[in-house]
Curated annotation (Swiss-Prot):
GO terms for molecular function: rRNA binding; structural constituent of ribosome. Gene3D superfamilies: Ribosomal Protein S4 Delta 41, Chain A, domain 1, RNA-binding S4 domain. It comes from Pasteurella multocida (strain Pm70). One of the primary rRNA binding proteins, it binds directly to 16S rRNA where it nucleates assembly of the body of the 30S subunit. With S5 and S12 plays an important role in translational accuracy. SUPFAM superfamilies: Alpha-L RNA-binding motif. GO terms for cellular component: small ribosomal subunit. Signal peptide: none annotated. The keyword rRNA-binding applies. One of its GO terms (biological process) is translation. This is Small ribosomal subunit protein uS4. Belongs to the universal ribosomal protein uS4 family.
Length: 206
């Protein structure tokens, strides 16, 4: 399955919430009818079955993190294998992706941009270049912008935008040095309350 390359806001309208695929910190309501699905009959909201609700939630989370179906299923299998709550384990694994950490630290305005920075070798982990977006960042890892990439205007602009976002408490960022530390594994209370991971577990448990 290929990565979706169409209009980003259409996906947010499909899910009925801002997926932060393109909007950064700006209110998405000012740009599109977020409560209306795309298409001629978007204003009509069909009543979803239990399966439909579970599928929509899975699609929403998958799109937030920019992950393909096969990757997402593998994350679920890993989360299920680990001790503890499967749904919470899933979110922790997704939050630990390098592209997500780069976004959370403010080096990129969106996760898609963060993925591009990683792929283009603009990011180092513990002093070594890592160009794999799915790389799992561990506690105490130091994630930084590569020295020769620090002059990129988009990174500087992203750091300015990040000042308007809520700062993750599990990360420690030095914006001046363009580096940060993954201090601890995030707890469920640290993450979005707009995600119902239990629906995803129910979907894959069938």
């Amino acid at each position: 399955m290929a990565r979706y390359l169409g209009p980003k806001l259409k996906l947010s309208r499909r899910e009925g919430t801002d997926l932060f695929l393109k909007s950064g910190v700006r209110a998405i309501e000012s740009k599109c009818k977020i409560d209306t699905a795309p298409g001629q009959h978007g204003a009509r909201k069909p009543r979803l079955s239990d399966y439909g609700s579970q599928l929509r939630e899975k699609q929403k989370v998958r799109r937030i993190y920019g992950i393909l179906e096969r990757q997402f299923r593998n994350y679920y299998k890993e989360a299920n294998r680990l001790k503890g709550n499967t749904g919470e384990n899933l979110l922790v694994l997704l939050e630990g992706r390098l592209d997500n950490v780069v976004y959370r630290m403010g080096f990129a305005a969106t996760r898609a941009e963060a993925r591009q920075l990683v792929s283009h070798k603009a990011i180092v982990v513990n002093g070594r270049v890592v160009n794999i977006p799915s790389f799992q960042v561990s506690v105490n890892d130091v994630v930084a912008v590569r020295e020769k990439s620090k002059k990129q205007a988009r990174i500087k602009a992203s750091l300015e935008l990040a000042e308007q976002r809520e700062k993750p408490t599990w990360l420690e960022v030095d914006a001046a040095k363009m580096e940060g530390v993954f201090k601890r594994v995030p707890e469920r209370s640290d993450l979005s309350a707009d995600i119902n991971e239990h629906l995803i577990v129910e979907l894959y448990s069938k």
